Amino acid sequence: MVYQPAAGARDLLPLDVAQKRWIEDKLQQVFHRWGYHRIITSTLERMDTLMAGEAIQRQMVIQLQNSEDEELGLRPELTASIARAVVTRMANLRHPQRLYYNANVFRRIWENRHNRQQEFYQAGVELLGVGGLLANAEVLLLAGNCLTALGLQDWHLILGEAGITRSLLDAFPINLRAKVRSAIAHLDRITIDTLPLTDELRERARIMLDLRGNSADVLQKVSSLNLDAEQQEAVNNLKSLVELLESGGKFPIILDLSLIQTIDYYTGLVFEIVNNTDSQARVLGRGGRYDQLLGLYHPQGENIPGIGFVLNIEDLYQVLLSTQQLPQETPASDWLVVPENPAAHSAAFAYAQKLRESPDLVRVELDLGSTDRATIKQYARDRSIAQIAWIKADGSPIIEKVSQ
């Protein structure tokens, strides 16, 4: 019998890990430079915690039960877990809270594909306790800084505003609103043309479908929809944000007020980070503002504003593969320490440890019993080990540089 990983699971071998760590280390450096601190939440959550935001479908959660028959689930995303942790464990801390994570998530994918991946790796940030223009700009600029740090050039940010989109949908009859929303989310003009709408509402839906493109053009189009005071204020805030982002130089934005995320706890900004390739556009991450989510977990129901984004490590990996930036092999050891005979075993361990205690990271291997010097040298060449220390019984070393 050949034992394989469970369906939807996979192993990461040393080179996979080195490449994943390269991406994560670059992102972590950016998070630290912006003043964010890492948070680690439980992989297991109570199902009522995961379902509280009404944004996660129960069937996508991989569920478990404990000995008390309590329903548990493997987290399908991080924001709900962090929201729960912040209001229950960090309530006395001052805001804003700048948090980042680097973790795995689990999702049951209901598609007709055998062994569809169910474990994913993500990195992201949450900025909690503050709303407004500057907080929104910080998170978007931080996302752009992450991509720049990874050496990615051909990306853009698709920016929407869930509050504006929802309020524009309020003009439609309640019994048709969900269908109009779905049609706009999927850019489905045929459905818009066939729904039983008045001419005025049908034209409104068509305009909403076209609220995508250059920021100045989109803002002009949405202003033609006879907005009320609240909607106009939201549009003005969006305009101020775009102007701030673009004032610092080129920041690639596509404004899209038809952008509707599948996770429905967003109350303001929503965005996707997209990379352009010759063959397709790949979504590298997404995020948005969720000013009512934390209130669902707060004992007194107090709303705490929040905004964040997540980057998908696997998608970043696929894009970076073609750039030749990722490590192409695992790090080589610096030394191979070889006891020349059994009497030198203790001295060899001591010498290897002395090398390892260097202030700089030094990778040191000990030969574990090879008797043929030619075999030892070939091993060092195959593993790109720079130096061999041959240890005599009296502890004295003979250093040999390995020609590659």
Curated annotation (Swiss-Prot):
<dbReference type="Pfam" id="PF13393">
    <property type="entry name" value="tRNA-synt_His"/>
</dbReference>
<keyword id="KW-0963">Cytoplasm</keyword>
<dbReference type="GO" id="GO:0005737">
    <property type="term" value="C:cytoplasm"/>
</dbReference>
<comment type="similarity">
    <text>Belongs to the class-II aminoacyl-tRNA synthetase family. HisZ subfamily.</text>
</comment>
<dbReference type="GO" id="GO:0004821">
    <property type="term" value="F:histidine-tRNA ligase activity"/>
</dbReference>
<comment type="pathway">
    <text>Amino-acid biosynthesis; L-histidine biosynthesis; L-histidine from 5-phospho-alpha-D-ribose 1-diphosphate: step 1/9.</text>
</comment>
<dbReference type="InterPro" id="IPR006195">
    <property type="entry name" value="aa-tRNA-synth_II"/>
</dbReference>
<dbReference type="InterPro" id="IPR045864">
    <property type="entry name" value="aa-tRNA-synth_II/BPL/LPL"/>
</dbReference>
<dbReference type="InterPro" id="IPR004517">
    <property type="entry name" value="HisZ"/>
</dbReference>
<dbReference type="InterPro" id="IPR004516">
    <property type="entry name" value="HisRS/HisZ"/>
</dbReference>
<keyword id="KW-0028">Amino-acid biosynthesis</keyword>
<dbReference type="GO" id="GO:0006427">
    <property type="term" value="P:histidyl-tRNA aminoacylation"/>
</dbReference>
<comment type="function">
    <text>Required for the first step of histidine biosynthesis. May allow the feedback regulation of ATP phosphoribosyltransferase activity by histidine.</text>
</comment>
<dbReference type="InterPro" id="IPR041715">
    <property type="entry name" value="HisRS-like_core"/>
</dbReference>
<keyword id="KW-0368">Histidine biosynthesis</keyword>
<dbReference type="GO" id="GO:0000105">
    <property type="term" value="P:L-histidine biosynthetic process"/>
</dbReference>
<comment type="subunit">
    <text>Heteromultimer composed of HisG and HisZ subunits.</text>
</comment>
<protein>
    <recommendedName>
        <fullName>ATP phosphoribosyltransferase regulatory subunit</fullName>
    </recommendedName>
</protein>
